[in-house]
């Protein structure tokens, strides 16, 4: 299927198949406006050619209701009916559309337009960057769940204690759906620095910072140490 992208992605997916993952999620970016050309074909390939359950990301801040409805039909036609419903990042200088200002708006629309879809929501153990505080953030998260999310997946984090604290607060708020932890191994220094710059709300514990400094000029050892820490993290 030539539409699914470059050979590196296909080879990586073939390797993953041997691990029998519970699912693979397919990302989408607001910067390209090309969900139909990238996300849908790749999700189709994973779901049908590789027989791995697939979740399609759907950031909607720059999409109209008509575009989202079309995307849902295209995904449904290839048997992909699990969605990670996202507002999506706002692009500096590009005015968002008004149909989906919040992820909750998208979740409510999907429930009405395609009730057979399983909707997953995003959550932020260390707080959404746009939220004034964690209490407000968890209140908004409860709205997502009430709107129709069957489960939640977290933004990546490196401090387990902050995740456990977040879980406890969600329980107190009446959020009773499964919360899946987002784990990303540190594989190289540039990746880690880029993540910290992009996700300014994320706390990097001292042990993670220590390996970045210790193996600054030894990329192979940094990769090995990053993977080992991720296994402990899990």
PLM feature spans:
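Alpha-helix-loop-beta-strand connector modules within alpha/beta enzyme cores
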Residues: 36-56, 100-121, 166-180
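Glycine-rich, positively charged N-terminal anion/phosphate-binding segment
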Residues: 6-15, 19, 32-50
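Glycine-rich, proline-tolerant flexible connector loops at the mouths of alpha/beta enzymes
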Residues: 21-40, 89-98, 153-163
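Catalytic-face loop-and-helix region of soluble metabolic enzyme cores
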Residues: 182-230
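Hydrophobic faces of well-ordered beta-strands that scaffold small-molecule active sites
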Residues: 1, 24-26, 54-58, 83-85, ...
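Conserved, mostly hydrophobic/aromatic
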Residues: 24, 75, 144, 148, ...
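Active-site mouth loops of central-metabolism enzymes
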Residues: 1-7, 55-66, 122-136, 214-227
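Conserved small/polar residues in nucleotide/adenosyl-binding loops
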Residues: 232-234
